[in-house]
């Protein structure tokens, strides 16, 4: 089909391919000559028909590629992190929905919540911890509704969620401390109650939600973590994180980590050929980040999906990071054209 398709745009090629597939699968009533004429192919209908229906023709190739993409795996995990609710990108739920039919698990690698209300960063107006809790609960309910095939949702601890522990530890009323849960994400597993203006509001725990109150977890042979370190050298964190866990004596093949709001990945051949993924973030940029410090670099946005079978080492070829465009570009606000 090469000669008579030469010069066609991608859109034109996709249209022809769709019509030919529909013809073979009986999904349209078009004759082969109709497809030839409508797309100005300048060939006899039998040339197109034979090219598409031949044992190694277009339809066979289409089926091969389709079935290859649909290879079955025991585990298909979507890894997201640094969502920083309520400052998440507007498309986070849509991204989860996009993969909801294929994934078996959703893993949140730290900083689901921002906990801005108990932050040490200066702010003229804060939204309040109660509002953050309710917002996050509603978000997780929506995720649970999207993942309606009983997919497990796993969360680990991030540095922002650790702010709750610091806040409680600084409280002067020691008698009140035992009544407060320093693990704020655990409240979405167990449920929680808010008392306001003499009224009681109860929020039930989210089904199929697991929280690991630690900065890393070993899921099969994948380490998921949220370290506190940064590095200005691209890819350096891949080595730093891998080296740390090898020194801890853990058995693993792959690492996925958040926190940096940057992205890099690769085989760490210096450390037993482990594969490490510095997973991008899914939050909007914060004002306090780009504030004049010259070491600042823009965030990278995205998420990662890993596919593997039980009792098998993760194959790096089945690891894919999806990169996203910047959702909010404030640079345009700082441009002035002089008359």
Q: Where are the regions that the model predicts?
A:
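Conserved beta-sheet core of the metallophosphoesterase superfamily
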Residues: 228-320, 332-334
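Short, solvent-exposed alpha-helical "recognition" segments
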Residues: 49-65
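Charged, low-complexity C-terminal accessory regions
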Residues: 18, 38, 44, 172-271
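Short, amphipathic alpha-helical "recognition" segments used to contact nucleic acids or chromatin
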Residues: 6-30
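Core catalytic region of metal-dependent phosphoesterases/phosphodiesterases
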Residues: 80, 85-191
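Active-site neighborhood of phospho(di)ester-bond hydrolases with catalytic His/Asp-centered motifs
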Residues: 79-81, 106-111, 152-159, 224-227, ...
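Short, basic interhelical loop/turn and adjoining N-cap
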Residues: 33-53
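Beta-strand-turn-beta hairpins that frame and shape the catalytic cleft
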Residues: 68-78, 216-223, 271-274
């Amino acid at each position: 089909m090469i000669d008579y398709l030469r010069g066609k745009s991608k859109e034109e090629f996709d249209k022809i391919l769709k019509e030919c597939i529909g013809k073979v699968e009986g999904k349209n009533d078009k004759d082969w000559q109709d497809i030839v004429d409508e797309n100005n192919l300048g060939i006899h209908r039998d040339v197109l028909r034979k090219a598409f229906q031949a044992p190694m023709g277009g339809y066979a190739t289409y089926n091969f590629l389709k079935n290859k993409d649909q290879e079955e795996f025991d585990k298909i995990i979507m890894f997201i992190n640094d969502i920083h609710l309520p400052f998440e990108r507007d498309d986070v739920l849509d991204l989860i929905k996009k993969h909801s039919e294929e994934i078996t698990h959703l893993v949140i690698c730290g900083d689901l919540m921002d906990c801005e209300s108990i932050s040490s960063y200066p702010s003229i107006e804060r939204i309040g911890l109660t509002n953050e809790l309710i917002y996050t609960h509603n978000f997780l309910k929506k995720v649970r509704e999207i993942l309606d095939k009983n997919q497990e949702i796993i969360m680990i601890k991030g540095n922002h969620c650790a702010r709750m522990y610091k806040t409680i530890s600084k409280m002067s009323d020691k008698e009140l401390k035992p009544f407060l849960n320093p693990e704020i994400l655990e409240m979405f597993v167990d449920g929680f109650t808010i008392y306001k203006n003499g009224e009681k509001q109860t929020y039930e725990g989210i089904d199929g939600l697991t929280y690991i109150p630690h900065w890393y977890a070993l899921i099969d042979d994948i380490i998921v973590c949220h370290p506190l370190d940064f590095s200005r050298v691209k890819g350096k964190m891949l080595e730093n994180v891998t080296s740390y866990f090898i020194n801890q004596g853990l058995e693993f093949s792959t690492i996925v980590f958040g926190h940096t709001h940057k992205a890099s990945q690769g085989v760490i051949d210096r450390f037993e050929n482990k594969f490490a993924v510095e997973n991008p973030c899914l939050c909007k940029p914060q004002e306090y980040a780009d504030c004049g410090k010259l070491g600042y670099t823009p965030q990278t946005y995205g998420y990662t999906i890993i596919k593997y079978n039980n009792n098998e080492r993760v194959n790096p070829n089945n690891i894919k990071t999806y990169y996203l465009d910047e959702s909010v570009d404030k640079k345009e606000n700082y441009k002035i054209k002089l008359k």
